[in-house]
Regions:
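Short helix-capping segments at alpha-helix termini
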Residues: 29-31, 56-63, 164-165, 187-189
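Internal, well-ordered domain-core segments that constitute the primary functional module
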Residues: 133-214
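Redox-cofactor binding/interface segments in oxidoreductases and associated redox assembly factors
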Residues: 77, 83-84, 148-149
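Long, compositionally biased stretches enriched for glycine and/or charged residues
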Residues: 188-451
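N-terminal Rossmann-like dinucleotide-binding module
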Residues: 7-36
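Rossmann-fold NAD(P)-binding glycine/threonine-rich loop
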Residues: 92-163
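Short acidic low-complexity segments
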Residues: 65-78
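NAD(P)-binding Rossmann-fold cofactor-contacting core
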Residues: 30-54
Length: 451
């Protein structure tokens, strides 16, 4: 009989996310007896997660053991899979700092977790902690596979494979499969009938093909129907995530201009480009329904909901949840059993996309089986899509170089190359903004930045 894997969860205080991932795990026959090692630096949140996970396990008829740890290396000992999901500095103080300091300098943001000054600062405070996980994995579980859910995904993934190329890791996001489901809803079709091919970089991948299976078994291109639905005012569907602030206009407008649909949400995409958020251009904000300061608002709401949900889970006799769209359990099951699956992952560009820089971090379809995660070759992207992605890769390249070489100048250069920042601020203003952000974050950032 096959032994059960050990699954270590770093950042287990993220109770709701843990619930989604492990809810999927416990419904996989091969993973029902897995050893779940929960690790968090906050003992209170760790214990809360333990209560929820135990009820989740019992409700699903799973019978593995659960251990709780505040020491990372202890939790990682002999792990087969390592799930990483944390936010260094949290909503308070660090996310608030990213938004408030930028706002003082005249730069508005929506999410600030991927690119721009917010994404840059988040990378600088996060990557050293990811490197420490890689260091510990090298020592106590060198053959484990890391499933990384931490943003900024591209910069984090790149920095890890640059310094620790021997660590098996993949960056995971739900934007590819999540957006496909949204588009199916917009067109009133069953998501199960979709067939698509998607590629690019994290939060800026495009559906190169988007098709639907017809009654006779053939596939038809959905793009003409999608464009017609948008122009007729029938798409996007309102309130798709229960959030009236986010109306998804930006992505549909980009689809009209580019001919391909992008994976990440409109509120994210608006700040990856120079076109939607400009000082004194309230007309653009109104026309494209750009939700400024969306992430801080979302954090406040999520914290309130989290406390309410947590109390419900703690008081419930059993917890039954629907399957999530996250790839984690699919990957674990495929590697552990050898049953092949396909996921979309963020990996090193080793000849996968010809017209993006070799070595940059790309998001492509990956085959997963007992051999591990095997990215598939895409070839050449449409040139205008590659050009747009390159503007974001420029920032990722410079920030990754900054932290690998401990070069503060490259942090300024990364901010200078950010499309949104460059459209709003002058060079000296960008330098002043970076200086203020570094000073405001203090010890949350690596020491070399303060030398």
């Amino acid at each position: 009989m096959m032994t059960a894997p050990k699954i270590t969860f770093i950042g287990a205080g993220s109770t709701i996310f843990v619930k989604n991932i492990l809810g999927d795990v416990f419904h996989r026959e091969a993973l029902k007896t897995a050893h779940i090692a929960l690790m968090d630096i906050d003992p209170t949140r760790l214990e809360e997660s333990h209560i929820v996970v135990r009820k989740l396990m019992d409700s699903a008829g799973a019978s593995g053991k659960i251990t709780c740890h505040t020491q990372q290396k202890e939790a990682l000992q002999d792990a087969d899979f390592v799930v990483v999901a944390f936010q260094i500095g949290g909503y308070e103080p660090c996310t608030v700092t990213d938004f408030e300091v930028c706002k003082r300098h005249g730069l508005e943001q929506t999410i600030a977790d991927t690119l721009g000054p917010g994404g840059i600062m988040r990378a600088l405070r996060t990557i050293p902690h990811l490197w420490q996980i890689c260091e510990d994995m090298t020592e106590v579980c060198p053959d484990a596979t890391m499933l990384n859910y931490v943003n900024p995904m591209a910069m984090n993934t790149w920095a890890m494979y640059a310094r620790y190329p021997h660590i098996k890791q993949v960056g995971l996001c739900h934007s590819v499969q999540g957006t496909a489901e949204e588009l199916a809803r917009d067109l009133n079709i069953d998501p199960a009938t979709l067939r698509y091919r998607c590629a690019g970089i994290n939060h800026m991948a495009f559906y190169l093909e988007l098709e639907c299976k017809t009654a006779d078994g053939s596939y038809v291109n959905l793009y003409p129907e999608l464009l017609a639905a948008y122009e007729a005012g029938q798409a996007p569907k309102p309130n798709i995530h229960g959030n009236t602030r986010c109306q998804n206009i930006v992505r549909y407008e980009m689809f009209k201009k580019l001919g391909y649909f992008v994976t990440e949400s409109s509120e994210h995409f608006a700040e990856y480009t120079p076109w939607f958020i400009k000082p004194g251009r309230e007309d653009l904000i109104e026309r494209y329904k750009v939700p400024l300061d969306e992430y801080p608002k979302r954090c406040v709401e999520q914290l309130a909901n989290w406390h309410k949900e947590l109390e419900e889970y703690k008081n419930a006799s059993r917890i039954d949840i629907k399957p999530s769209r996250e790839y984690a359990s699919t990957i674990m099951n495929a590697i552990w059993t050898g049953e092949p699956s396909v996921i979309y992952g963020n990996v090193r560009n080793d000849g996968l996309i010809d017209n993006l820089p070799q070595g940059c971090c790309v998001e492509v379809a990956c085959l997963v089986d007992a051999n591990g995660i095997q990215p598939t070759k895409v070839g050449t992207l449409p040139s205008h899509l590659a050009a747009l992605m390159q503007t974001n890769i420029n920032v990722q390249t410079l920030l990754t170089e900054a932290i690998l070489t401990e070069n503060r100048d490259r942090v300024y250069h990364a901010a200078m190359m950010d499309p949104h920042t460059a459209a709003v601020l002058g060079i000296d203003e960008i330098y002043a903004l970076v200086d203020d952000l570094i000073a405001a974050h203090g010890d949350w950032l690596p020491g070399w930045l303060h030398r």
